[in-house]
């Protein structure tokens, strides 16, 4: 998902760099993730990465926030069908970190997103679709190829 969301990103390089920084005992790495309409659809994988890093390194901290720009990138732009996918991903992610006190902030943000998905009215799905069409055309790739299902 990182590669789709931010063209040019090579996830293995990002992960390798995070590990190299965490291995330096005098550094306290802070992994700060921006959750978008795309990444929330694979939230469980991001949490798996957080857990993997926390299990290997005690000096690492995590933070996440949700994107609101560009217009159409917020998870609140998802339609009913994709909100169900996101809700399931968030629920799975919360279960994975339930017994991890160091991930309290992450759990709180996930719960906030879960509430938003169920309470915030659907709006701007067309903007997300248009942005996705633009990305797919510009990058010669497909949302469907990355996620395994159609967005619209």
Task: Label every PLM stretch briefly.
Residues 1-152:
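Radical SAM enzyme [4Fe-4S]-AdoMet core and its adjacent flexible, acidic
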């Amino acid at each position: 998902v990182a590669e789709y969301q931010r063209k040019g990103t090579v996830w293995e390089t990002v992960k390798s760099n995070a590990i190299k920084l965490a291995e330096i005992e005098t550094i306290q790495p802070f992994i700060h993730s921006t959750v978008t309409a795309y990444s929330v659809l694979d939230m469980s994988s991001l949490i798996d990465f957080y857990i993997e890093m926390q299990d290997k390194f005690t000096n690492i901290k995590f933070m996440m926030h949700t994107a609101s720009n560009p217009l159409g990138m917020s998870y609140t732009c998802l339609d009913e069908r994709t909100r169900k996918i996101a809700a399931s991903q968030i629920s799975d992610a919360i279960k994975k970190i339930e017994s991890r006190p160091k991930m309290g902030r992450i759990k709180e943000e996930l719960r906030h997103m879960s509430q938003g998905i169920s309470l915030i009215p659907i709006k701007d799905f067309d903007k997300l679709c248009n942005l996705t069409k633009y990305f797919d055309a510009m990058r010669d790739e497909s949302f469907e190829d990355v996620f395994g299902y159609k967005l619209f």
